[in-house]
A protein has these predicted regions:
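Helix-loop boundary and gating motifs at the non-cytosolic
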Residues: 1-48, 206-210, 215-232
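Helix-to-loop junctions at the C-terminal end of transmembrane segments
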Residues: 50-67, 156, 253-266
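A membrane-interface helix-boundary motif in multi-pass transporters
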Residues: 69-70, 153-170, 346-371
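Structural signature of the two symmetry-related core transmembrane helices
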Residues: 69-86, 268-283
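Hydrophobic core of transmembrane alpha-helices in multi-pass small-molecule transporters
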Residues: 83-90, 94-113, 292-306
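Intracellular juxtamembrane helix-capping segments at the cytosolic ends
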Residues: 112-125, 306-320
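C-terminal transmembrane helical hairpin of 12-TM major facilitator-type secondary transporters
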Residues: 267-310
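A late C-terminal transmembrane helix in Major Facilitator Superfamily
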Residues: 322-352
């Protein structure tokens, strides 16, 4: 199940990349002005935020009917893939409303492939193996991030119908394989009655606040600062080969770091990864040579891989058992809110304003370090809650 989720996340993320590459052209075909494209991306993130949390909670309510949940995930995915496949065909019809409607259907149903599969991993993968499973889950996203710049170059002049069709078919096939694995293992790894009470209250609140800070820090560091940072020291034609450095670090460390998460716990390793990422982001912001910048970006990506894998493992542990989908859905929703905020800043042209540039330079490091302190507190609170049932 965990291995299948790697492929699901890979094809889901690659589909998003294909969508972003072709959205300006599709919007123009549908009669939407170019200025509306960022607003469509903003709408997507708002839908992700709402649906990720809602579907995660739904997965908790269906905890006793795994086969029914598997069927629901597959059905939602088939609807999502169908809508995605239709996008390059409905755009030439020249109807902005139709393009937006199909996009909304795709965005809403694709959320079935984030929190619900994680909830299933939380129930069906034994606790000690969950960090490794979380690493596999996130590795698919990391691989997609690494190949995205090359995909942008390769698809620049291609007919959009073929990439959309290949992405939709690949995602549907991977999801069918994953849901088959769910049906083959319908019983939880640990009986419900023998598992400790979920950790609620202060540790979860501190964890989610840290996730919000980490998500915002990542959006500023990679989506806003990375390309301009490289262009300070490198040629524009080298950018597609430099941007994947972050994701190479992410992919190389994510599975080895899961071994440390297994031993020390998700919040503790998130705190370590956040602190390391904050320091690496500070070096990136002040790098005076391309070599230093590349090395710092590599370590920033490695730290982010540790953070994200540990965050998923921590969400599953905090939600155990019966609330895995709720906590995992909240995590994904907050990451979508972070992306929403970044797109809103771009629409407002904040990154182009000279007064904001120094703030954007040091903000990722500051937010990641602050999140590290919060997570250290969350780890302490979690240990107290595990030993004292009176802890809120």
């Amino acid at each position: 199940m965990a291995a299948a989720s790697l492929w699901v996340q890979l094809f889901l993320a690659l589909g998003w990349t294909v969508y972003v590459i072709y959205l300006p052209a599709l919007a123009a075909q549908a009669g939407l002005p170019k200025a509306m494209v960022p607003w469509l991306l903003l709408l997507d993130q708002a839908i992700f935020a709402a649906m990720d949390w809602a579907l995660g909670t739904m997965a908790d309510r269906m905890a006793g009917a795994m086969e029914r949940l598997a069927n629901a995930i597959l059905l939602a995915t088939l609807v999502s893939c169908g809508a995605f496949l239709m996008l390059p065909f409905v755009a030439p019809a020249g109807s902005p409303a139709l393009l937006v409607a199909v996009t909304v259907v795709w965005s809403a149903t694709s959320s079935a492939l984030r929190a619900p599969p994680l909830a299933l991993i939380g129930r069906h993968v034994p606790g000690p193996s969950q960090p490794w499973a979380a690493g596999l889950f996130m590795l698919g996203l990391g691989i997609a991030g690494a190949v995205a710049p090359y995909l942008t170059i390769a698809l620049k002049e291609a007919d959009p119908r073929l990439p959309f069709a290949l992405s939709a078919v690949a995602l549907a096939a991977a999801t069918a394989f994953m849901t088959r694995a769910i049906r083959a293992n319908p019983q939880p790894a640990t009986p419900m009655a023998s598992v400790s009470t979920p950790v609620r209250g202060r540790p979860v609140a501190m964890f989610l606040l840290a996730v919000a800070l980490l998500g915002l820090g990542f959006q500023v560091h990679f989506a806003l600062n990375a390309a301009p940072g490289f262009l300070r020291l490198a040629k524009p034609e080298d950018l597609p080969y430099l941007m994947p450095v972050f994701w190479i670090g992410f992919n190389l460390l994510i599975l080895p770091a899961s071994l440390a998460t297994k031993r020390y716990g998700g919040p503790a390793m998130m705190a370590i990864g956040a602190a390391a990422g904050g320091l690496a982001a500070a070096v990136v912001a002040n790098a005076g040579s391309l070599g230093v910048l590349v090395v710092a970006q590599f370590f920033a990506g490695a730290a982010w891989g540790c953070v994200m894998m540990s965050a998923l493992a921590a969400a599953l542990a905090m939600g155990r058992t019966g609330r895995e989908g709720f906590v995992a859905g909240a995590l994904w929703a907050l990451l979508a809110v972070a992306a929403f905020t970044r797109i809103a800043l771009v629409i407002a042209q904040v990154p182009q304003q000279p007064a904001w540039k120094p703030l954007l330079g040091w903000a990722p490091g500051a937010m990641w370090l602050a999140a590290g302190l919060l997570l250290a507190g969350a780890a302490t609170a979690s240990r107290r809650a595990a030993t004292d049932p009176r802890t809120p």
